[in-house]
Amino acid sequence: MSEKTVRTLTGKVVSDKMDKSIVVLIERRVQHPLYGKSIRRSTKLHAHDENNVAKLGDLVTIKESRPISKTKAWTLVEVVEVAAE
């Protein structure tokens, strides 16, 4: 059997108000198709945080998983960097 590679992303927690859920802002840089200027693009993803470990401003790693709810299909892997108080 072939192993499936798991997609992982790193981003900043922008909301932790929900129970067992966080919103993670993923930023990436893309080049403008015509002008070539480097532009920042961002995506907000809802992720499952079973033990409510991640706090606002933390840098976290999330992985793709099965759909947990209508908007949640990612799971928290680890907190990479804790936000300064």
Curated annotation (Swiss-Prot):
One of its GO terms (biological process) is translation. GO terms for molecular function: rRNA binding; structural constituent of ribosome. The keyword RNA-binding applies. One of its GO terms (cellular component) is cytosolic small ribosomal subunit. It comes from the Bacteria. Keywords: Ribonucleoprotein, Ribosomal protein, RNA-binding, rRNA-binding. Pfam families: Ribosomal_S17 (PF00366). PROSITE patterns: RIBOSOMAL_S17 (PS00056). Belongs to the universal ribosomal protein uS17 family. One of the primary rRNA binding proteins, it binds specifically to the 5'-end of 16S ribosomal RNA. Part of the 30S ribosomal subunit. HAMAP family: Ribosomal_uS17_B. This is Small ribosomal subunit protein uS17. It comes from Acinetobacter baylyi (strain ATCC 33305 / BD413 / ADP1).
